[in-house]
């Protein structure tokens, strides 16, 4: 897969149990450690709440909840993702790493 400049695409990776996942670095705005998440009552599965970033509120998705796997909640790492005109955070509960395709 090629990036915008024709180079190999870079990804921010993280592991959930024994599976590796990645988000294209072109879509990543920010990575936050230990951000504050405000729970939302009656939120659908996978939406763990909202967080504030630079004066705006954004939804936070929890991949562990979406995939229905247990999580050690002592660590929180949120990746801000941009997709077209939408922004949201993904809480991955692990330290992300960089890799290339």
Region locations from a protein language model:
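An acidic, low-aromatic, low-complexity terminal/linker signal
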Residues: 1-101
């Amino acid at each position: 897969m090629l990036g915008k400049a024709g180079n190999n695409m870079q990804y921010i990776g993280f592991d959930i149990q024994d599976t590796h996942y990645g988000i294209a670095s072109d879509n990543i705005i920010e990575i936050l450690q230990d951000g504050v998440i405000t729970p939302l009552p009656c939120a659908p599965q996978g939406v763990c709440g909202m967080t504030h970033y630079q004066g705006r509120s954004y939804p936070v998705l929890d991949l562990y909840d979406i995939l229905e796997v247990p999580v050690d909640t002592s660590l929180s790492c949120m990746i801000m993702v941009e997709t077209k005109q939408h922004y949201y955070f993904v809480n991955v509960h692990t330290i992300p790493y960089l890799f290339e395709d």
